[in-house]
Amino acid sequence: MDEVAPGLLVGTMSDAEDESLLRRCGVDAVVSLTYDDPDTGAVARVDAPMTDGPRNEYEAFAAAAETVVERREAGQRVLVHCSAGASRSPAVAAAAMARLTDRGLDEAFEQVLARRSEVDPHDALVRRAATFVTEGSE
């Protein structure tokens, strides 16, 4: 699990199920992008399942990213996770970060990559992120 921006963490399914790790990192909410149900213990979990790759639907992506934005605006420390923490969760985190900070999506992705080496989002998710950021600036 890596903190890619203040209060915004990206991780794996294993991270989401490690209640001790979640507590040590001060995580208030877990946004789960998988179709599995991780046991986050006492930490609040928001299910926002979405597929990886070209079959990903924009509505699912936008709902997940908007959930992260809302939780961060409420001052919560949020872990966004998918299976490996390499494609879906970094893309959603970068989109939320771009929306929260009014910075460009490229800069947000660069920051995520600088803080988490296992980042390789599918091109379709990068496109969904760009649409989310663009729609938020209108």
Region spans (language model):
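Cys-dependent protein tyrosine phosphatase-like superfamily
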Residues: 1-77, 93-138
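A phosphate-binding catalytic loop at a beta-strand-loop-alpha-helix junction
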Residues: 76-92
